[in-house]
């Protein structure tokens, strides 16, 4: 079964969930804020998504970080993401072992079938 990693208040996550439901695709959701983001789960995600692609530099959370935190991203990214799950790009759709679709735009899930 597919897993959709979301933050419930994210509009793009809602669109992704709706697209999967409309296609009749079975999936479970995992709310990164409510359900928590452990170091183990983050490592699991980063096995399928490059760290540079996982950090959402367009988020309010990113903009609110100090310049020092942004500059130390190479060494502290994992710790920052665990502290601030909204730094992780989302939604993340886990479609297979170590295979993730990052973000969502209309039509992204068309190839998944139903």
Q: What is the role of each PLM region?
A:
Residues 1-23, 27-32:
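Local sequence-structure signature of Cys/Sec-based thiol-disulfide redox active-site neighborhoods
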Residues 32-114:
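Thiol/selenol-based redox catalytic cores and closely related redox-interacting motifs
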């Amino acid at each position: 079964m597919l897993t959709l990693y979301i933050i419930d208040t994210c509009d793009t996550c809602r669109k992704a969930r709706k697209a999967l439901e409309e296609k009749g695709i079975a999936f479970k959701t995992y709310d990164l804020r409510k359900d928590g983001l452990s170091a183990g789960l983050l490592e699991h995600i980063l096995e399928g998504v490059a760290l540079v692609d996982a950090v959402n530099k367009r988020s309010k959370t990113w903009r609110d970080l100090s310049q020092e935190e942004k500059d130390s991203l190479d060494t502290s990214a994992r710790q920052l993401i665990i502290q601030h799950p909204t730094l992780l790009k989302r939604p993340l759709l886990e479609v297979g072992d170590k295979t993730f679709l990052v973000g969502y735009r209309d039509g992204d899930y068309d190839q998944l079938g139903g």
